[in-house]
Amino acid sequence: MARYTGPSWKLSRRLGISLSGTGKELEKRPYAPGPHGPGQRKKLSEYGLQLQEKQKLRHMYGVNERQFRTLFDKAGKLAGKHGENFMILLDSRLDNVVYKLGLARTRRQARQLVNHGHILVDGSRVDIPSYLVKPGQTIGVREKSRNLSIIKESVEVNNFVPEYLTFDAEKLEGTFTRLPERSELAPEINEALIVEFYSR
């Protein structure tokens, strides 16, 4: 399944969550798109709820189905709770860490920065958005890319960095100090439903 590239606001309303991180998509119209307005949401079956939760998380991180399933299977081989491990692995992706550091305003922008070779990991260029960042690794911006407006504007408006990250706005450099705890990640997601979906 290919990555969704359509209007994010429309998808946000369909899934009932903000994919931009701003919440603006749901402020005026907190219901699914379509001609029937706010009363059109149907009661979902158990399978429908599980599928919807999977789609919410997949689109939140902007990954395709193959990448999503591969990471889910990888999480299942780790000690601990399968669902929590999966959430932590998703959050450890390089594109997500770039976004959480405030170097991009959306995960889609962060993925583009990585793809185009603007991001360094421990001083070396890494252009793979799915690269899993390890605790202790440093994320920075290439010298030639430091004046990109997309980065400068993002850093200027960002006023929150999670506790498991540190960020130096002057150096445009951050450190993934530790793995996040489940309580620090997407409270609107019920990962148990996703585990149930893939266990069918």
Curated annotation (Swiss-Prot):
It comes from the Bacteria. One of its GO terms (cellular component) is small ribosomal subunit. Coiled coil: none annotated. Pfam families: Ribosomal_S4, S4. Residues 92-155 form the S4 RNA-binding domain. The keyword Transcription regulation does not apply. SMART domains: Ribosomal_S4 (SM01390), S4 (SM00363). Transmembrane segments: none annotated. Belongs to the universal ribosomal protein uS4 family. Part of the 30S ribosomal subunit. Contacts protein S5. The interaction surface between S4 and S5 is involved in control of translational fidelity. One of the primary rRNA binding proteins, it binds directly to 16S rRNA where it nucleates assembly of the body of the 30S subunit. This is Small ribosomal subunit protein uS4. It comes from Bacillus subtilis (strain 168).
